[in-house]
Structure formats: C-alpha cells, structure tokens
Amino acid sequence: MTRQTTRAVAAETAGGRAPGPNGLHPLTDRDGNARLQRYEDRVKTAFDRIVPVLKQISALQHESDFEQHAQSIARAELGFDLPEYMLADAWVTQLDLRRLFAWCVFETYRRMADDFFANDPLGGREVHALDRFLQDCGFHQLDVTPCADGRLAHAISYVLRLPFGAVRRKPYAGGLFDVENTVSKWGEVELGRFREGVPNTADSPTRYLKTVIYHYSSVDPHHQGCAAHGSNDAAAAQAALDRLLAFRQSVENGFCCGASVALLLIGMDTDTDAIRVHVPDGEGRMDLTQSVDAIKVHAITRDLEPAAARARVAELVKAHAPASADPGMLRLVARLIENNLSQIDYVRQVHGGRYADAGHAERFMGVGIGFEEIQLRNLTYFAYLYTVEEGAADLDVGRKIFGGLNVSRGLPIPIVIRFDYHGGVPGARERA
C-alpha cells in the first residue's frame, strides 16, 4: 500500500513538559466527555447484553416454567418482555434463537431511538450557537459526508463535537457521496435563503460548505483502513477530493457562481479518533500532502493555559495552511481541531488511547434515509438509499462486514429500514 506523506505540525514537540491536570488538555471539555461516556456505555451495553441473555434463556427452554422464567430474565437484563408467541412452543420445538436475536436488536434500537428523540441526550438540537459561528465564518450550511463505515458513525457528535441538528450528515461507502443528490440539496438550501431567509438571506456573503471525512488506521493501516479503497488512505483521500471537486464543478456548470460552494477534506484515524484537516487555499484547492494534525496540535499545546492554548491552535492552523486560505475557513478549522482535542482525551481516558475494536463491530445495518439518532461508533453500518438497486454497492459492503460479524456465528444480519418523508406533502407517508 502507498501511504501519503503529510506535512503537518511535526516540526514542534511538547518539549518534555509535564502534562496538565489528570493528563488532560486544557481545552478538553471534561463535563462533555463524562456525558458522552454515560450515553455510549448505556446504549452499547443494551445491545451487548442481548447474546448473553439469549444464551441464558436458551439453556432453560425445556423447563416447566420456561416462559415465566425467560420473561423474568429478559425484563431484568434487557428491560423489556419478549414476544409470547416466540416462547410458547419452545417445549415442542427448539427456540428460534435467530429470530429472537433479531427481534431483541430491533426492540433495543426502537427504545434507543425513542429516548434519543424524546430526551435529546447529546444536546444535538442546541444549534443556534453553531449556526451563528458558521455564518460568522462565511458559511450558511455545513454538509458532511463521512464514510459509511460504522467506525465513523460518531463523527459529528463525538469526533467533531458538533450538534447533529446543525449539520447535514449523509454517509456513503468510501465517502463517495451522490453528486446529483448533493446538488439537489444545495439548490433546496439556496431556495430557502431566497424565499424564506433561512438560515440567512440570499444576498448574505456566505457559502454552502461540503465536507468529506475519509479514514485510515494507525494500528493496522494495511487491513483496517477504508475497505472501499483497499485500506489505502492516499487513495481514499484522493477519491474524496475528486468527488468534492465534481460537486463544485456541477454547481458551476448548472448555476454558475462557484463561489457559493466551499469544500473541506478531513482525515480521521479510526483507532484514536484524531483528525487531520486539509485546509483549502483561497481558490478552494487542497494539497493532500499538507494538513493540520490534531494529535500533534494536542501534544504541542497541552501544557499551556486555556487562552494561550486556544491562541496557539489558531496559530498552528494558519501556519500549516496555504497563505491564501480564507480567514473564515481558518477559524472554522481551528474550532474543529480544538473540538477534536476533547475527543482525543476521551479515547485516551475511556478506551486506553486506542479502541479495542480496531475493525468492524457494528450491531446492525441501517438502510434507507435519515438515522440522525445513530451517533455512536461501531453501532451501525449505513447504507443510504432510496432503492435497493441504487444502493447495491453499499449493501454489498455491509453484507461482507456482517458476514464476518454475524453470519459466521450463525446469527442473522439485523437490518433497520428507515425512510423520512415530508409530513406537509399529501400522501407522502403512504408512499414512504
């Protein structure tokens, strides 16, 4: 595999100084990290209990009080009752554990989704501050495409620490987003500015910002990188950049005024959650050999006072960006790097510096449209699609992943189908 060389912030070191309190960076959001850990633990534990509980229930299926005993265990360990019809005939035939497993996954997902929308545990609807900041930086929409790999499912709420409600997120395998769909979304946003003044008026000097997050592995770069690009991070970055440029060209060809579109490319280490950002120059061009590496910024600034650390982050971003880079883009990148410092410390504190599951460990496949409730790493593999035919490539990748995770153990592949519809359009629900 050919690995790209990166001219990042390697020239400076932390100078051997002692780390800050508890070894955390001075800009780390300690309260935020604690809240995110509680949520991650609660949700993943709910899914990970399913197999041990079903093993326990399976061993009891020929006892005289099996149904009552099984329900008691499920209620205590999983928090819900099992379908009675799945248990009633266990004394005659073997308990259908594959079917019961799938049902438990779906019920656990439903409970998680209900809690997410009812209680907003991640504070993702607190969007006003970010909306104002983005517009101050010169952007009226942040549209992010991470790879569909489940190891990037937490990219918005955890890795970048952005409120999910302020970001359009639509993952695709390899980060290869649908250009036509994105142009359509761009047109929808611009029409909203023109007709409604949302999020700002059409004459405001702001742009639509399209971002792609590609990924790589620092632990096992030859095998645990992006499967869609053969674990070649240089190929992943180039393919993402090519897709971004195709989007901009499409807007310019169809509507002229390419200045209304801005582009940004981010790399993410799926073992540490550290990001590297390829800052564009004033014309929107990005050099894949040039980036700002958050994990190196962390080392350089972790022993400073908070105000000094924030200023130094901004200096490092500017120093390692093209001279003609837009000031608003530099502000945004500095904020993303600063936010990522908290996630670097989160992985160090909670997961020992690197995730134990370097590869895939998704619990189910999410197929369709939507899924803003999925904000956790390695919980879901995404296959965004309107029809099976157009999403065949993403579905094939998901089938391969779950062939190793589930099918090899005799378990089915749980698939949650989700489709959002416009409630104001007559008949939309029935068509969905």
Residue spans for each PLM region:
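Divalent-metal-activated hydrolytic enzyme cores
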Residues: R3-Q141, D149, G175-L209, S217-A432
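Catalytic core of membrane glycerolipid acyltransferases/transacylases, capturing the structured
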Residues: F139-P171
